[in-house]
C-alpha cells in the first residue's frame, strides 16, 4: 500500500497515513493533499511579524501599531540601501553614457555621480586613450603585382554615445574599413611606387579614405595617425627587388654627392674668376698707363734729340744699359783700357747673388708673352702675392 493512500491500517479506516505513522488530520473534509495556498502562507507570515512587533490575536494579518512600524523600518532600510548603492565614480579620462530604462538619456562627466539603481544603467567609456589596430596582408597592385603591406592606425573615441550605439562594434568596423581602404589605395598604385617613394602618398590617401568612412557611418571615432609600417615583395622575387632598391639608393647617393660637390666648388670657381678678371683689368690699365708714360717721356726728349741726336742717343743707351746691368752681378771690364785701377765691391756683389730675383717695377706690354695662372695646389701660397698691384709673369 502506498503512502497516504486511504485504507484499513490498524483500524484507521478512511484516514491518510504517512510513513511515520502520523495521520494527516489537518486535511479534513476529504480534501486531497496539494500545493500550499499562497494566501495562507502570507497570513501566517503576517501573524508572525505582527506578534513579534506587538500585534496580538486575530485570524488575519494585523497592520496596526507595531506591525506598521516594523514595515516602515524595513522599507526605510531598503530605500537607504537603494539610495547609497546608486553612487558611482567616472574616471578623469572617461565619460559615462546613461541609459534610462534602456533608452539613451545623457552623458555624465568625470567625478562622483548618482543614478537611480535598477532604473539607470551607466557605461563608462575612455575618451582619451589612444587605441591602435593593424591591417596587413597580400594585396594586388595596379600593375598586377602582389605585395605584402602592413599599416598601423591610431585612433581615439570622440563621441561615447555614437561609439557604443551607432554601430554594432565600432572597433571591428574600423578594422574592416581600414583593410578595405588600404586595399583600395594599394590597388590604385604601382608596385615600384609602393616599395620606394610612394609610401607617404599611400599613407595620406588611406587616412583620407578612413575619415570619409567614419563620417559616413557616424562611428564617433577620430583618426589620430596612420603609420605605413612595411611593404615588401613576395619571397620569390625579393632578392631581385632588393638589388633594384640598392641600385636606386646608390643613384640617389651619387646625385647628392654631386650636388654637394657642385655647391662647394662653384662658389670657389666663381670667386676665382672674379678675382682673375679684376687682376686682368688692373694689368690692362697699368700697362696702358706705362705706355702712355713712356710716350710722354719720348715726346719730352724729342726736342733734345732733334737738337743733338748723337748725344741724346748715347745718353739713352747708357741709361738703358745701366738699368739692365744694375740687377746682375756680372762685371764687364774693357781689356783695352789704359790700365786704370778699378774698385770692385766684392761684398755687395756677393750679396746680390743671394738675393731673390725681384720683378721689374716697370714693364712694357711687349714683355708679357703670357700670364701663368696659379694652380689649385699653390693657391694658399699665392694669396698674399695676388694682393700686390704688380702681377708676376714669365717673359
UniProtKB/Swiss-Prot annotation:
Membrane topology: Single-pass membrane protein
Keywords per UniProt: Membrane, Transmembrane, Transmembrane helix
Keyword Heme: no
GO cellular component: membrane
Family from the record: Belongs to the band 7/mec-2 family. HflK subfamily.
Transmembrane segments: 67-87
InterPro entries: Band7/mec-2_domain (IPR050710), Band_7 (IPR001107), Band_7/SPFH_dom_sf (IPR036013), HflK (IPR010201), Membrane_HflK_N (IPR020980), Stomatin_HflK_fam (IPR001972)
Sequence ranges of Low complexity compositional bias: 1-26
The organism's taxonomic lineage, starting at the top: Bacteria, Pseudomonadati, Pseudomonadota, Gammaproteobacteria, Vibrionales
NCBIfam families: hflK
Biased composition range(s): Polar residues: 353-395
Compartments where found: Membrane
Annotated function: HflC and HflK could encode or regulate a protease.
Top-level taxon of origin: Bacteria
Gene3D superfamilies for the chain: Band 7 domain
Disordered: annotated span: 1-40, 352-395
Cross-referenced Pfam families: Band_7, HflK_N
Quaternary organization: HflC and HflK may interact to form a multimeric complex.
CDD domains, sorted: SPFH_HflK
Protein name per its UniProtKB record: Protein HflK
Organism: Vibrio cholerae serotype O1 (strain ATCC 39315 / El Tor Inaba N16961)
Amino acid at each position: 500500500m502506498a503512502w497516504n493512500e486511504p485504507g484499513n491500517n490498524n483500524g484507521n479506516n478512511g484516514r491518510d497515513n504517512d510513513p511515520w505513522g502520523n495521520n494527516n488530520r489537518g486535511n479534513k473534509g476529504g480534501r486531497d493533499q496539494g500545493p500550499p495556498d499562497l494566501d495562507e502562507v502570507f497570513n501566517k507570515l503576517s501573524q508572525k511579524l505582527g506578534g513579534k512587533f506587538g500585534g496580538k490575536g486575530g485570524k488575519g494579518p494585523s497592520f496596526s501599531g507595531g506591525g506598521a512600524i516594523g514595515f516602515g523600518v524595513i522599507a526605510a532600510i531598503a530605500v537607504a540601501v537603494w539610495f547609497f548603492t546608486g553612487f558611482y565614480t567616472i574616471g578623469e579620462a572617461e565619460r559615462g553614457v546613461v541609459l534610462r530604462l534602456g533608452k539613451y538619456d545623457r552623458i555624465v562627466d568625470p567625478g562622483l555621480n548618482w543614478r537611480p539603481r535598477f532604473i539607470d544603467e551607466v557605461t563608462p567609456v575612455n575618451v582619451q586613450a589612444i587605441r591602435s589596430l593593424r591591417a596587413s596582408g597580400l594585396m594586388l597592385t595596379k600593375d598586377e603585382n602582389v605585395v605584402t603591406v602592413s599599416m598601423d592606425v591610431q585612433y581615439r573615441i570622440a563621441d561615447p554615445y555614437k561609439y557604443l550605439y551607432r554601430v554594432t562594434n565600432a572597433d571591428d568596423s574600423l578594422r574592416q574599413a581600414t583593410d578595405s581602404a588600404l586595399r583600395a589605395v594599394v590597388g590604385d598604385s604601382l608596385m615600384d611606387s609602393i616599395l620606394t617613394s610612394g609610401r607617404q602618398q599611400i599613407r595620406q590617401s588611406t587616412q583620407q579614405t578612413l575619415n570619409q568612412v567614419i563620417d559616413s557611418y557616424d562611428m564617433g571615432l577620430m583618426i589620430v595617425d596612420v603609420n605605413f609600417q612595411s611593404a615588401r615583395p613576395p619571397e620569390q622575387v625579393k632578392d631581385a627587388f632588393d638589388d633594384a632598391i640598392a641600385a636606386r639608393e646608390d643613384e640617389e647617393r651619387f646625385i647628392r654627392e654631386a650636388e654637394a660637390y657642385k655647391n662647394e666648388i662653384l662658389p670657389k670657381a666663381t670667386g676665382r674668376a672674379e678675382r682673375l678678371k679684376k687682376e686682368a683689368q688692373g694689368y690692362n690699365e697699368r700697362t696702358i698707363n706705362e705706355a702712355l708714360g713712356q710716350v710722354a717721356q719720348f715726346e719730352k726728349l724729342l726736342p733734345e734729340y732733334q737738337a743733338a741726336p748723337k748725344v741724346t742717343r748715347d745718353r739713352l743707351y747708357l741709361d738703358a744699359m745701366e738699368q739692365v746691368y744694375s740687377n746682375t752681378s756680372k762685371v764687364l771690364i774693357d781689356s783695352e783700357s789704359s790700365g786704370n785701377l778699378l774698385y770692385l765691391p766684392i761684398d755687395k756683389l756677393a750679396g746680390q747673388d743671394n738675393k731673390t730675383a725681384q720683378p721689374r717695377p716697370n714693364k712694357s706690354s711687349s714683355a708679357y708673352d703670357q700670364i701663368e695662372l696659379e694652380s689649385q695646389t699653390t693657391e694658399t701660397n699665392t694669396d698674399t702675392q695676388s694682393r700686390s698691384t704688380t702681377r708676376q709673369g714669365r717673359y
